[in-house]
């Protein structure tokens, strides 16, 4: 039989309806996170992402977005096998043996003889991040949903000590994907830096936090930068951060904080140059310190105001704003 192309015979669901469903799911996600129901909150986020993916697939006349979401979910689940292998001293099999049992084929064509489980897991998470971006087709609504799912992992890290590192790493995947889709999403950049600080990946944390501060300065981001530079032992940068924090707290700056404007090059010049592989000063400080004042501060809201989301005929480019009053402790 000759192959035939199947086309849609009904008009696709309108963007207003898609928006309404996403708002409902994000609100339920927020309510569940307030009750520390992280898994249920995450499921709401994933289902919202699936609804967006299906709407995009129908409009594009293909089937790429939803399968990409499924591939991302599977890759993150399978990445845990490498973590479990490391915790069991490799008793679950070698890296190549573990990869052979997986659906994710990102490493299947490589010689994995000398590849550690942790490195393999890194590639799985990178693959998942790219598939999440493919799922949304760079749709800004997707960035909001990815941010919410990242929040579920961040909250999980606060309640489940056994899975703390995996929760940090998965939160990084979703925050990073959200930021790639919408570079102006300040909260995603700040939370990405916050999670990277927990993993002591200070150079990457600096990139995220500097980007967040340059996008929209806030006292929360300045506090995170203060903690970052404290760990690096960078006294001049700590002094700069302290001045920025003070500028938000002075009575004269209640309306508009007096924040010094720096170019990216000027900003980075105040940071230390750390050679590759050289540990930063004070990098052994634990995030989970009992001294709460020295911890990085997490921001649980969005800086974006709620906006009216108008539909577009083909590839929409909507403003974000689902999180105006959500995700606040």
Sequence positions of predicted segments:
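Alpha-helical linker/edge segments of TPR/alpha-solenoid repeat scaffolds
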Residues: 2-8, 67-107, 232-242, 250-255, ...
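Amphipathic alpha-helical repeat scaffolds of TPR domains
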Residues: 20-27, 49, 55-115, 126-129, ...
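Alpha-helical solenoid repeat scaffolds, predominantly canonical TPR units
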Residues: 25, 32, 44, 51, ...
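Residue at a conserved register position within TPR or TPR-like alpha-solenoid repeats
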Residues: 32, 153-156, 160, 196, ...
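Short coil turns that delineate tetratricopeptide repeat
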Residues: 46, 53, 140, 183, ...
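Canonical positions in the second alpha-helix
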Residues: 48, 135, 177-178, 211-212, ...
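Alpha-solenoid helical repeat scaffolds
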Residues: 59-61, 147-148, 187-191, 220-226, ...
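Structural signature of tandem alpha-helical TPR/SEL1-like repeats
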Residues: 122-130, 162-177, 199-210, 234-242
């Amino acid at each position: 039989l000759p192959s035939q192309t199947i086309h849609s015979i009904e008009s696709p669901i309108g963007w207003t309806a898609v928006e309404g469903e996403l708002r409902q799911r994000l609100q339920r996600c927020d309510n569940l996170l307030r009750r520390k129901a992280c898994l249920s909150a995450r499921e709401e986020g994933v289902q919202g992402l699936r609804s967006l993916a299906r709407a995009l697939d129908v409009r594009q006349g293909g089937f790429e977005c939803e399968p990409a979401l499924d591939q991302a979910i599977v890759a993150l689940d399978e990445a845990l096998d490498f973590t479990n292998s490391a915790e069991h001293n490799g008793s679950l099999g070698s890296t190549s043996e573990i990869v052979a049992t997986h659906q994710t084929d990102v490493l299947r064509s490589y010689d994995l003889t000398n590849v550690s489980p942790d490195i393999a897991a890194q590639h799985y998470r990178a693959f998942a991040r790219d598939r999440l971006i493919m799922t949304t087709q760079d749709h800004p609504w997707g960035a909001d949903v990815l941010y919410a799912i990242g929040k579920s992992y961040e909250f999980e890290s606060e309640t489940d000590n056994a899975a703390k590192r995996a929760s940090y790493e998965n939160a990084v995947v979703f925050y990073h994907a959200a930021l790639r889709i919408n570079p102006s999403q300040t909260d995603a950049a700040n939370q990405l830096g916050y999670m990277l600080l927990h993993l002591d990946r200070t150079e990457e944390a600096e990139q995220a936090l500097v980007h967040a501060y340059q996008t929209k300065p806030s006292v929360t981001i300045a506090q995170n930068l203060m903690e970052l530079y404290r760990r690096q032992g960078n006294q001049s940068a700590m002094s700069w951060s302290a001045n920025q924090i003070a500028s938000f707290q002075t009575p004269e700056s209640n309306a508009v904080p007096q924040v010094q404007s720096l170019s990216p090059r000027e900003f980075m010049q105040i940071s230390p140059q750390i050679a590759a592989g050289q540990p930063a000063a004070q990098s052994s400080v634990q995030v989970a310190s009992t001294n709460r004042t020295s911890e990085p501060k997490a921001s649980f809201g969005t800086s974006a105001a709620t906006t009216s989301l108008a539909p577009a005929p083909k590839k929409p480019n909507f403003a974000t704003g689902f999180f105006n009053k959500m995700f606040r402790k």
